[in-house]
Amino acid sequence: MLVFIDADTILPKYFIQSFENRVNEKHFQAGSFTQKMDSDNLAIRAGAHFMSGYMRLMQYTPWPIGFGCLYITIEAFNAVDGFDESLYIMEDYDIILQAKRAGYKIGIIKMGCLASDRRYKNNSLHQILRGIYGELYRYTHGLRITKPIYEYNMGGEDKDNSKDTDPSKQKFK
């Protein structure tokens, strides 16, 4: 099993044991983990809760999604040729969709991984609107976004370099 976890995520104490138990119990072959947002801001925490619920709902549709923390069997990863590097954004959504289309069992596991709010602290409304726009774009222009639809700074890069957003230097509350 391959597990991909965002750099700014803290895993629960018994993550590996719990993860293995849930995957083996349900026979999941690809999917994602729910996340909680480490934030003092109620709106940011509520947004993360909504997105976890949305992700869990989408696993039962023809268009499952996963983000932040993903898992996939090596067999499924190879069958879908891994992450598609031609995608501009949402490659994590795409690999889960491709695994489902290839016949692999998808599951969203409720794990309580703790994610940093660093991307949302200063521009949460902007981030939320971009996320909604990205979702609407996917469903109206095809599920694969291969061209820039908005500016996206990978890994928390700050375009004006006025503050350090390196995830390895972030502190959790």
Residue ranges of predicted features:
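Conserved nucleotide-sugar donor-binding
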Residues: 66-80
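Conserved donor NDP-sugar-binding/catalytic core segment of glycosyltransferases
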Residues: 13-43
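Short, flexible, basic/aromatic active-site loop/helix in glycosyltransferases
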Residues: 32-68
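Short glycine/serine/threonine-enriched helix-capping/active-site loop
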Residues: 4, 31-34, 109-111, 115-116
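Acidic donor-binding loop at a coil-to-helix junction in glycosyltransferase catalytic cores
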Residues: 89-95
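Short aromatic/basic micro-patch
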Residues: 71, 89, 107
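Hydrophobic helical membrane-anchoring modules
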Residues: 100-173
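Short beta-strand-to-loop acidic/aromatic patch adjacent to the donor-nucleotide binding site
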Residues: 1-10
